[in-house]
C-alpha cells in the first residue's frame, strides 16, 4: 500500500468524521445574539479532529467571536475556526501568545499586521481585525475552508496542466498586486502558504488513471475560470517573511524621493524576483508532484539552488508540454535580471493557454530514465505499507497559520517534500542576502536555524524588517550535518514502480 493510498484513506476518514462531528455540534446561531451567550457556547465547543471532547479555550478580547474548533498550532500561536457575531460569517482567528515572545518577535507581529492591512485583493487572505490584550495578539482573518494547497498536491499526486495553470495565474494576480500596487514582496510563496476555497467536485466521465500512476485520483472535470479537484479561489497567506520595497505614497523605493541609491533600486528588483523564482518552484511541484531542488546533503542542496541546477526528469515530465517547461525555466533562471518578471509571466503562451511554443525556446531537459544512470535525488513519493504511520488524531503544523482540515500522516514521503521545499526556499532567501553555498552550509550548523541567519542579517540594521522563519534547520541536520530524510532516486518506490512498468 502506498503512502498516497494511505493518505487518501485518511483524508476520506477525516472528511466523513468531520462531517459527523460538525453535524453533532451545530448551533442555531440565530437563537441568541447576546455576546455572553456566544462566549458560553465557545467554551462548550469541541475540537472536530477527535472523538474525545476537548474544550476550546476562551480568550479575553474575543467576546465578539464564537470559537468553534482548533485548526492548528504554531510556535507561539493557535488558529481557530470561529463565527464572527458582527460579520455573521465564519472566520479564522490566530491567537498569538504575546507573553512568550521577545521584543523582536513582537515587532514581527506588528510588521505582518501592518503589511496585511495595506493589502486588499481577492487572492490574498484578508485581515478583518487585530486585537491586542495584555497577554495575546488576535488576528481575525478570512477563512479558507479548503486548507493548504500542499495537501491537494499530495492527494492527487500531481495536477493537470489546466488545473496548475488555473492556480498559478491566481497566485500571479496576487503577486502582481503586491508588487505593483502595494510595493510588497511576499518572499515565502510555497504550497503550504497557498490556501483555497473549495468548489463542488465534478468527476470526469470514464476516467482512466495514467499507466504510470494507476492509483492517481481523478481530479474531476476542469471548468475554465472555476477550477477542478475541489480547488477554486486561491489565497496567499502568511506574510511573516514579507517586506516593503517601496513607499506607496511616493511610488519610489523606500527612502527620500530622488535620493534612493542604486543598490536600493536594485534591491527592489532582486526582492520582487524572489517571488517569481518561488512561483517557478510551485508550478514545477504542481505539475510533477515534487520540488525542483532536492539533495541528501545540505551543502549540495544549497549549491543546486544557488546555481539553478534542476532537471525535468523522465518519465515524470515526458507528457508535460514543452511550453510549460519553458516557462518554468524562465522563472527559475539564476540571474534575477534575466528571470521573468510578473508582466513577462502573463505574456507567456502557456499562461495564455496557447498551443504555440515561444519563439526563443530555452529549456534544456536532462533526462535520466534508468536507475543505472547518474546519481539523482528524488523525494520518496511512495513507501511500503510497513512505513505508513497514520495518526489517530490530526497532526498540528507549526509552519502555517491557517491549516487544512486534512490530517497529515507522519511518513518519510510527505515530510521529505515539506523539508526539501522549506530548505530550498530559505536558501534562496539567504542567497539574496549574499551568502555563498559554502557560507550557507557552515553558518547553518553554527547558528542552528535559518531563522537566526536571516534575523542576524536583516534586523541588525532595521528593526522593522524582522521576519519569522518557520523552518528550523537543525530539525533537518543530524549531529554530523547529514540530512536524516531520504531523497535518493534509487530508493524511491515511485521511481521503481514506474521504471518497472516501462520495462514491461
Swiss-Prot record:
The keyword NADP does not apply. Belongs to the protein kinase superfamily. CAMK Ser/Thr protein kinase family. CaMK subfamily. It is found in: Cytoplasm; Barrier septum; Forespore membrane; Ascus epiplasm. PROSITE patterns: PROTEIN_KINASE_ATP, PROTEIN_KINASE_DOM, PROTEIN_KINASE_ST. It comes from Schizosaccharomyces pombe (strain 972 / ATCC 24843). GO terms for biological process: cellular response to oxidative stress; mitotic DNA damage checkpoint signaling; negative regulation of G2/M transition of mitotic cell cycle. Its EC number is 2.7.11.17. The keyword Nucleotide-binding applies. Interacts with sty1. Transmembrane segments: none annotated. The lineage of its organism: Eukaryota, Fungi, Dikarya, Ascomycota, Taphrinomycotina. It comes from the Eukaryota. Its main location: cytoplasm. One of its GO terms (molecular function) is protein serine/threonine kinase activity. Has a role in the regulation of G2/M transition during the mitotic cell cycle. One of its GO terms (cellular component) is cytoplasm. The active site is at residue 188. This is Calcium/calmodulin-dependent protein kinase type II. Keywords: ATP-binding, Calmodulin-binding, Cytoplasm, Kinase, Membrane, Nucleotide-binding, Phosphoprotein, Serine/threonine-protein kinase, Transferase. Autophosphorylated. Residues 65-351 form the Protein kinase domain. Coiled coil: none annotated. Pfam families: Pkinase (PF00069). It catalyses: L-seryl-[protein] + ATP = O-phospho-L-seryl-[protein] + ADP + H(+); L-threonyl-[protein] + ATP = O-phospho-L-threonyl-[protein] + ADP + H(+). Its cofactor is Mg(2+). InterPro entries: Kinase-like_dom_sf, Prot_kinase_dom, Protein_kinase_ATP_BS, Ser/Thr_kinase_AS. ATP binds at residues 71-79, 94.
Amino acid at each position: 500500500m502506498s503512502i498516497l493510498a494511505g493518505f487518501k484513506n485518511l483524508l476520506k476518514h477525516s472528511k466523513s468524521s468531520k462531517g459527523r462531528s460538525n453535524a453533532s455540534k451545530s448551533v442555531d446561531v440565530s437563537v441568541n445574539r447576546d455576546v455572553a451567550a456566544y462566549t458560553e457556547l465557545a467554551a462548550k465547543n469541541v475540537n472536530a479532529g477527535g472523538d474525545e471532547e476537548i474544550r476550546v479555550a476562551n480568550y479575553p478580547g474575543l467576546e465578539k467571536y464564537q470559537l468553534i474548533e482548533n485548526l492548528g498550532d504554531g510556535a507561539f500561536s493557535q488558529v481557530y475556526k470561529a463565527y464572527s457575531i458582527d460579520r455573521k460569517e465564519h472566520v479564522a482567528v490566530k491567537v498569538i501568545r504575546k507573553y512568550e515572545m521577545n521584543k523582536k518577535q513582537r515587532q514581527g507581529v506588528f510588521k505582518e499586521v501592518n503589511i496585511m492591512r495595506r493589502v486588499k485583493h481577492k487572492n490574498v487572505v484578508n485581515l478583518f481585525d487585530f486585537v491586542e490584550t495584555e497577554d495575546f495578539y488576535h488576528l481575525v482573518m478570512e477563512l479558507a475552508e479548503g486548507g493548504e494547497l500542499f495537501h491537494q498536491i499530495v492527494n492527487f499526486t500531481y495536477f493537470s496542466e489546466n488545473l496548475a495553470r488555473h492556480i498559478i495565474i491566481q497566485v500571479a494576480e496576487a503577486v502582481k498586486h503586491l508588487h505593483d500596487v502595494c510595493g510588497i514582496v511576499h518572499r515565502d510563496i510555497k504550497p503550504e502558504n497557498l490556501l483555497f476555497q473549495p468548489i463542488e467536485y465534478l468527476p470526469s466521465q470514464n476516467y482512466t488513471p495514467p499507466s504510470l500512476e494507476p492509483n492517481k485520483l481523478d481530479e474531476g472535470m476542469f471548468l475554465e475560470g472555476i477550477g477542478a479537484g475541489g480547488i477554486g479561489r486561491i489565497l496567499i497567506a502568511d506574510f511573516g517573511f514579507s517586506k516593503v520595497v517601496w513607499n506607496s505614497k511616493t511610488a519610489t523605493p523606500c527612502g527620500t524621493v530622488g535620493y534612493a541609491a542604486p543598490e536600493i533600486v536594485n534591491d527592489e528588483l532582486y526582492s520582487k524576483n524572489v517571488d517569481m523564482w518561488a512561483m517557478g518552484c510551485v508550478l514545477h511541484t504542481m505539475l510533477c508532484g515534487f520540488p525542483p531542488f532536492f539533495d541528501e546533503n545540505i551543502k549540495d542542496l544549497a549549491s543546486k539552488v544557488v546555481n539553478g541546477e534542476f532537471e525535468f526528469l523522465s518519465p515524470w515530465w515526458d507528457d508535460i508540454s514543452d511550453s510549460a517547461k519553458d516557462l518554468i525555466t524562465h522563472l527559475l533562471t539564476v540571474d534575477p535580471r534575466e528571470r521573468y518578471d510578473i508582466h513577462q509571466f502573463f505574456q507567456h503562451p502557456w499562461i495564455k493557454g496557447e498551443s504555440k511554443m515561444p519563439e526563443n525556446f530555452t529549456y534544456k531537459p536532462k533526462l535520466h530514465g534508468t536507475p543505472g544512470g547518474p546519481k539523482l535525488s528524488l523525494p520518496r513519493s511512495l513507501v511500503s505499507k510497513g512505513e505508513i504511520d497514520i495518526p489517530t488524531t490530526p497532526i498540528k503544523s507549526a509552519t502555517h497559520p491557517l491549516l487544512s482540515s486534512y490530517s497529515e500522516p507522519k511518513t518519510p514521503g510527505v515530510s521529505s517534500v515539506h523539508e526539501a521545499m522549506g530548505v530550498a526556499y530559505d536558501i534562496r532567501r539567504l542567497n539574496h542576502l549574499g551568502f555563498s553555498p559554502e557560507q550557507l552550509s557552515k553558518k547553518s550548523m553554527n547558528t542552528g536555524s535559518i531563522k537566526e541567519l536571516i534575523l542576524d542579517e536583516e534586523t541588525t540594521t532595521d528593526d522593522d524588517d524582522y521576519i519569522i522563519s518557520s523552518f528550523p534547520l537543525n530539525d533537518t541536520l543530524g549531529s554530523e550535518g547529514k540530512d536524516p530524510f531520504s531523497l535518493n532516486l534509487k530508493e524511491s518506490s515511485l521511481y521503481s514502480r514506474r521504471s518497472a512498468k516501462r520495462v514491461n
